[in-house]
Amino acid sequence: MPSGSHWTANSSKIITWLLEQPGKEEKRKTMAKVNRARSTSPPDGGWGWMIVAGCFLVTICTRAVTRCISIFFVEFQTYFTQDYAQTAWIHSIVDCVTMLCAPLGSVVSNHLSCQVGIMLGGLLASTGLILSSFATSLKHLYLTLGVLTGLGFALCYSPAIAMVGKYFSRRKALAYGIAMSGSGIGTFILAPVVQLLIEQFSWRGALLILGGFVLNLCVCGALMRPITLKEDHTTPEQNHVCRTQKEDIKRVSPYSSLTKEWAQTCLCCCLQQEYSFLLMSDFVVLAVSVLFMAYGCSPLFVYLVPYALSVGVSHQQAAFLMSILGVIDIIGNITFGWLTDRRCLKNYQYVCYLFAVGMDGLCYLCLPMLQSLPLLVPFSCTFGYFDGAYVTLIPVVTTEIVGTTSLSSALGVVYFLHAVPYLVSPPIAGRLVDTTGSYTAAFLLCGFSMIFSSVLLGFARLIKRMRKTQLQFIAKESDPKLQLWTNGSVAYSVARELDQKHGEPVATAVPGYSLT
């Protein structure tokens, strides 16, 4: 076909597509009305408790199973005749991949559905565990048990946690406490069961059975019924337009370079809208705080038992300390969530989170002075309780900053930020122990890291409140009839009286004032 007729054919297709847009606009308006009819407030119960149960099982099948992988440590080391460092990489890889790929889980959940994401993750995790039962080398386990299983867990973990936040508002902290207690309860139950399976069926049989158990993630995914909330920052019209734009992109992108450029622009706009919270100053501060918090919390679970042994505690008593820490962690998950949902603390959940992180940091600072079992038992109780407390409030604090709509994507980023500290903090602590000959420097560094995390968030919140108070004072001084609002950089004063013609408030910039 001549080039001129080719251009004419392409042009006619584009013109036809453009002529169809008015009809599509009517369809979009109709769908927007349907979406508005379906939107609802968080039910704070009902099917929400099934979502909590599903998330509880997800945390058992992901975080508890990950913790139980350490039970295979001696079996892997003996069978493959490898040293501690090589064998320890298995646990580090699965934990790191789970956190690193958490944003991928959010993307799949947002663009397909939470149900599809969790079911797909369950299939991948189960496949990884089953293939691991046929491993012939540690490198095989790095790929199957580490990467494949970790990727499956990542697709399940953050979407399930985000779904709880969509179904609860008044009792959100309690719901998260119950859901995330699955990690501690699952470890408490699965640890002896996995040890029994290894004794009865060898490590290969135990991994095969765990692979079948993890398939329950697919059942959990089926429980995650989607819900549309009234308070979502993106309106139903915006959501439908974004979906329709993606369909249009697939339909017209082959026709011309112009439509390809338009398609890329639309995709960038959709992604920019989904991750717009990354530009929020509050979220940036939270992200930095999470890095320091994650660095501090990890080494204790690796070095508490060795430290107890170094101060003269027996092997059985040292293991008992870890059991205490795990059980109290569960209590902290549930009770602290319930307490912060009470009316007297409901508006101070952010402060409660800071308090819990700071208390764990103080426990670290006291640990080098505790050199007997009667002193280490109260330490395990205190650290375990506040560890469970702040883990419960991480999604609550994230919701307060970014809102419910962006919660899944934001949690993906927050858990992604845990990955590198989880990977590097135990080796750094070990190097400090080897260099100094004691655990003091390692524990002090972890303690100051967690305290800095708490102080940083608290200081940022204090500055934000001082700024808000100052802006309100300026507005009242300039004109008592004016109300103040801000776009993040420039302060505006808005008259309470509405314009009679258009029914819209009149906004004028506050002279001589800027937030930056």
Curated annotation (Swiss-Prot):
One of its GO terms (biological process) is creatine transmembrane transport. It holds the Pfam family MFS_1. Creatine uptake is inhibited by carbonyl cyanide 3-chlorophenylhydrazone (CCCP) and by valinomycin. It is found in: Cell membrane; Basolateral cell membrane. It comes from Homo sapiens (Human). Most highly expressed in kidney, followed by retina, lung, heart and testis. Very weakly expressed in brain and liver. Also detected in lens. Gene3D superfamilies: MFS general substrate transporter like domains. It is linked to Cataract 47: A form of cataract, an opacification of the crystalline lens of the eye that frequently results in visual impairment or blindness. Opacities vary in morphology, are often confined to a portion of the lens, and may be static or progressive. In general, the more posteriorly located and dense an opacity, the greater the impact on visual function. CTRCT47 is characterized by the association of cataract with microcornea and renal glucosuria. Microcornea is defined by a corneal diameter inferior to 10 mm in both meridians in an otherwise normal eye. This is Monocarboxylate transporter 12. The chain crosses the membrane at residues 51-73, 88-108, 116-136, 145-165, 178-198, 207-227, 283-303, 319-339, 350-370, 377-397, 410-430, 440-460. Changing residue 329 to A: Decreases creatine efflux activity. Loss of localization to the plasma membrane. Changing residue 360 to A: Does not affect creatine efflux activity. Does not affect plasma membrane localization. It catalyses: creatine(in) = creatine(out); guanidinoacetate(in) = guanidinoacetate(out). Interacts with isoform 2 of BSG; this interaction is required for its localization to the plasma membrane. Residues 1-50, 461-516 are cytoplasmic. It is a multi-pass membrane protein. Its main location: membrane.
